[in-house]
UniProtKB/Swiss-Prot annotation:
Subcellular location as annotated: Nucleus, Nucleolus; Nucleus, Nucleoplasm; Dynein axonemal particle
Record keywords, A-Z: Cytoplasm, Developmental protein, Nucleus, Repeat, WD repeat
PANTHER family in the cross-refs: WD REPEAT-CONTAINING PROTEIN 18, WD-REPEAT PROTEIN 18
PROSITE patterns cross-referenced by the UniProt entry: WD_REPEATS_1, WD_REPEATS_2, WD_REPEATS_REGION
Protein name, entry field: WD repeat-containing protein 18
Pfam families: WD40, WD40_alt
Phenotype reported upon loss of the gene: Affects the left-right asymmetry of internal organs, but not their specification.
The UniProt record lists the keyword Lyase: no
First-listed, main subcellular location of the protein, grouped into a coarse class: nucleus
Gene3D superfamilies in alphabetical order: YVTN repeat-like/Quinoprotein amine dehydrogenase
Family affiliation: Belongs to the WD repeat IPI3/WDR18 family.
Its job: Involved in left-right determination through controlling the correct clustering and migration of dorsal forerunner cells (DFCs) and Kupffer's vesicle formation. Component of the PELP1 complex involved in the nucleolar steps of 28S rRNA maturation and the subsequent nucleoplasmic transit of the pre-60S ribosomal subunit.
Length: 431
């Protein structure tokens, strides 16, 4: 049997049978399960198609599994506090976590903590990257959502405080969910709130494009890939489908079921915590506190299949099937380093850095450090001077110094070659 194009990934708060599991989106049959702990809401993410990360419910660490080694919990990433939301960038270079009212940004290649963003006034509830990893959006219990430009966050030196690109402040109660559409910095983002509204914004301008008012608080939200419809999960168990192509659509709208695409999916008996649409837009996945995950046909609004969990569903999504998921003999290309709990320790010189290659962009340094190749050429010139002019004196001391320099040149050339090969693999790796 060929590997599926998409799979369903879900988790519940009980964790009695497994932490999270992978299912066939067509039949609902289980493919794989990952054991150890239980994952909190909005805190299950795939890192670079090679790892599954899940924040432990009520604890200050993140569980990590290699994606093809389902029966063994690989490691635990200890965090400065309880993680309330978690997201890995689609390009696999960064990990974001909401801890209390702060956003923590880690660099995956080194494990360095690059930034702590403390603009929210209350705990974070959700955080999402755009599809091109250029921006991320955070939402919290303070009724605020912030749009952040990733490059501006990682470029800033420690003497400057990163600022969000836009502040979205139209909600009057806590934000419960965020969904970013396609098109990177030109995308639209939807925010759901307990104030019974879902609002659609433009990332580039921060302008509100649409506000839809419902009769109940909204716990989850998503678009279909073409953004024909907006799907909103209510606290009463209903899922509301809002047509974004309706001729009667206005900026401020009250939801009413009609014949123009505004419809209701009925079946859940408790609040809907998760929503996700397949890449072709034909099926909708939902997870609920009624301990079920359901797959719906978008056109007919009928439930195709149901998966029963042992506790309230905290995470459920339709995701592209990672290439390594069904290959038992495959391994991650790069080991996952230990994540630091302090801001960029390699720069602070506390000796806790991993020594890996840093991908931090545009660091503000007065005297940029030379490349390994430049260092090697400089050492080679120095060796020639030693040989020709006996800079370090005559006899045995000169020979020892020359040997040391030759060894250092060989080491630097090897490091430069390894860096080049790693960068080439990273840039040519298919998405």
């Amino acid at each position: 049997m060929s590997a599926p194009v998409e799979v369903v990934l879900s988790a519940d708060s009980a964790g009695q049978l497994f932490n999270c599991a992978v299912y066939d989106p067509h039949t609902g049959s289980e493919f794989l399960s990952y054991r150890g702990g239980n994952t909190s809401s909005r805190s299950l993410t795939i890192l670079n198609g090679e790892y599954i990360l899940g924040a432990q419910l009520g604890k200050n660490y993140i569980n990590v599994w290699e994606i093809q080694r389902k029966d063994q919990l690989q490691q635990k990433i200890v965090c400065p506090g309880i993680v309330t939301c978690l997201c890995a960038s689609p390009d696999g270079l960064y990990v974001l976590a909401g801890i209390a009212e702060a956003i923590y940004l880690w660099e995956v290649s080194t494990g360095n903590l690059l930034a702590i963003l403390s603009r929210h006034f209350q705990d974070l509830s959700c955080i999402k990257f755009t599809d091109d990893s250029s921006h991320f959006v955070s939402g919290g219990k303070d009724n605020l959502a912030f749009i952040w430009n990733l490059s501006s966050v990682v470029q800033l030196d420690s003497s400057r405080t990163p600022e969000p690109r836009h502040i979205l402040s139209r909600h009057s109660l806590p934000i419960t969910d965020i969904h970013c559409g396609l098109m990177g910095p030109q995308a639209r983002v939807a925010t759901a709130s307990l104030d019974q509204t879902v609002k659609v914004w433009e990332i580039s301008s921060g302008e509100m494009l649409l506000s839809v008012l419902f009769d109940v608080g909204i716990m989850s939200v998503t678009f279909d890939p073409c953004e024909y419809f907006l799907f909103c999960g209510g606290s009463d168990g209903n899922i509301f489908q809002v047509s974004l192509c309706s001729t009667s659509l206005s900026r401020d709208k009250t939801f009413q079921s009609d014949s123009e695409g505004n419809q209701v999916f009925k079946g859940h008996r408790n609040l809907v915590t998760c929503l996700s649409v397949s890449m072709d837009g034909t099926v909708l996945l939902s997870g609920s506190n009624d301990e079920t995950v359901r797959m719906w046909d978008v056109q007919s609004k009928q439930c195709i299949w149901t998966i029963n969990h042992r506790g309230p569903v905290t995470n459920a999504a339709i995701i592209p099937a990672p290439a390594n998921m069904f290959l038992s003999d495959s391994h991650p290309a790069v080991p996952l380093p230990r994540f630091s709990r302090h801001l960029n320790p390699s720069e602070q010189g506390d000796g806790t850095g991993t020594g890996g290659m840093s991908l931090r962009l545009g660091a503000n340094t007065q005297e940029p450090e030379g490349t390994y190749l430049e260092k090697a050429e400089e050492l080679y010139s120095l060796m020639c001077a030693v040989t020709d002019k006996s800079v370090f004196g005559d006899g045995e001391n000169t020979k020892v110094r020359v040997s040391e320099l030759e060894e250092e040149v060989r080491t630097l050339k090897k490091i430069n070659k390894d860096l080049y090969e790693f960068s080439t693999q990273l840039l040519t790796k298919p998405n």
